[in-house]
UniProtKB/Swiss-Prot annotation:
This is Glycerophosphocholine choline phosphodiesterase ENPP6. It holds the Pfam family Phosphodiest. It comes from the Eukaryota. Zn(2+) 2 binds at residues 193, 197, 356. Homodimer; disulfide-linked. Homotetramer. SUPFAM superfamilies: Alkaline phosphatase-like. The gene is ENPP6. GO terms for cellular component: plasma membrane; side of membrane. Binds 2 Zn(2+) ions per subunit. It is found in: Cell membrane. The modification Phosphoserine is found at residue 71. Residues 1-22 form the signal peptide. PANTHER family: ECTONUCLEOTIDE PYROPHOSPHATASE/PHOSPHODIESTERASE, GLYCEROPHOSPHOCHOLINE CHOLINEPHOSPHODIESTERASE ENPP6. The active site is at 71 (nucleophile).
Length: 445
């Protein structure tokens, strides 16, 4: 009797130990600056590629980014499931007073130092450490050695990828999936963000950029079928933030009108969020001057709202300036960000007309999330999610155990065909039951 009971208990233990879902391949798209309403129900009527994806998969109402609603902080929140103050990538421009090193939009040599990147482990590092094969195309940071690890393949971002680059990346990613060379492929596309900055979020140029993405999405769904990948490949599409209109004629805050810039030890960033390090002995003077400036809010580090999940960041400055929506903070008029024309002369052609970085609860800062594939429901609309929630979902469909994170599994589990399945990794109740059963087996032995 004991022997039969032991066999039954062993079978139960083994069944509980199995992963909740089969491990499948994952293709991820990061569409920079793609605002939620760019694929509203009305907009989808003229976007057949996205419309097909929505009908075949999951679409959330909107995605709330982390504060600040800038690119690098949200790149890392997406891939770690952690808020900015946890993973430490707190801006597009950062400064470390201890080493006098700067992170400048990832383009300067010091931006590749482990100092900025080793605060958390992104998904591609976790997968690579697990001997999984990762291919990344233009993804910012894939060229950096993080925690001693690089992905299997990184096509480094050096300039804005063209539409042809994007098409080739999608086709190449599907080819390496088909040949068994990749378990995860991640593709970054920037044109929607670029056109939104240059011409504004409602401009024809921005709309043309979305249509260009839509065309590639339509080809992608066709190519997946042609390569017979539809039963083994999940696709997840998200953005890092939205975009809002800005005005250069009457909504610019020039700091040199209020403070002596020589009283600053360091200044980083311009636009919606600016970081100030006052010179020794100048903190109170600078604070009292800038806090009277209209159309922006000034926070001492300890007073930053907790809902931003920002103030505990290692590289957060003593004073943070946050502009009202549509306003732009800069050192002086000479520092306004002209954009260059495409002619040989490369002369400044005009000011930019769109920006992001504002309060993450603003409607214009909302991003997108779409997913389809064998693990996802079809024609399913989900409630809003937050940028940190996506990490757990990616871990789930790739079959890896997530690291500790700030995401909510309850907000994303409804998207899966098997919503009753456990969160990534063994659920606590199952783990406890397995332990009890193992003890019983030991007693019966």
């Amino acid at each position: 009797m004991a022997g039969k009971l032991g066999v039954l208990l062993l079978a139960l233990v083994l069944s509980l130990a199995q992963p909740a879902s089969a491990r499948r391949k994952l293709l991820v798209f990061l569409l920079d600056g793609f605002r939620a309403d760019y694929i509203s129900d009305e907009a989808l009527e003229s976007l057949p590629g996205f419309k097909e994806i929505v009908s075949r998969g999951v679409k959330v109402d909107y995605l709330t980014p982390d504060f600040p609603t800038l690119s690098y902080p949200n790149y890392y929140s997406l891939m770690t499931g952690r808020h900015c103050e946890v993973h430490q990538m707190t801006g597009n421009y950062m400064w470390d007073p201890d080493t006098n090193k700067s992170f400048d939009l990832g383009i300067n040599r010091d931006s590749r130092l482990p100092l900025w990147w080793n605060g958390s482990e992104p998904l591609w590092v976790t997968l690579t450490k697990a001997k999984r094969k990762v291919y990344m195309y233009y993804w910012p940071g894939c060229e950096v050695e993080i925690l001693g690890v690089r992905p299997t393949y990184c096509l480094e971002y050096k300039s804005v990828p063209t539409d042809i680059n994007f098409v080739n990346a999608v086709s190449g990613a599907l080819d390496v999936f088909k040949s068994g060379q990749a378990d995860l492929a991640a593709i970054y596309y920037e044109r929607v963000d670029v056109e939104g900055h240059h011409y504004g979020p409602s401009s024809p140029q921005r709309k043309d950029a979305v249509k260009a993405v839509d065309t590639v999405m339509a080809y992608m769904t066709k190519w997946i079928q042609e390569r017979d990948l539809q039963d083994d490949l999940n696709v997840i599409i998200f953005s890092d933030h939205g975009m809002t209109d800005i005005s250069w004629t009457d909504k610019v805050i020039k700091l040199d009108n209020y403070i002596n810039l020589r009283d600053l030890q360091q200044l980083k960033g311009r636009g919606p969020v600016v970081s100030l390090w006052p010179a020794p002995g100048k903190h109170s003077e600078i604070y009292n001057k800038v806090r009277r400036v209209e159309h922006m809010t000034v926070y001492a580090k300890e007073d930053i709202p907790s809902r931003f999940y920002y103030k505990k960041g290692k590289f957060v400055s003593p004073l943070t300036l946050v502009a009202d929506e549509g306003w732009f903070i800069t050192e002086n008029r000479e520092s306004l960000p002209f954009w260059m024309n495409s002619t040989v002369t490369r002369k400044p052609e005009g000011w930019q007309w769109g920006w992001h970085g504002y309060d993450n609860e603003l409607r214009a800062m909302r991003g997108i999330f779409l997913a389809f594939g064998p693990d996802f429901k079809s024609d399913f609309r989900a409630a809003p999610i937050r940028v940190v929630d996506i990490y757990n979902l990616m871990c789930k469909v790739t079959g890896v155990t997530p690291l500790p994170n700030n995401g909510s599994w309850s907000r994303v589990m409804c998207m899966l065909k098997d919503p009753a399945s456990s969160a990534p990794g063994a659920p606590p109740c199952a783990c406890a039951l397995v332990t009890v059963l193992l003890v019983l087996l030991a007693i019966l032995a």
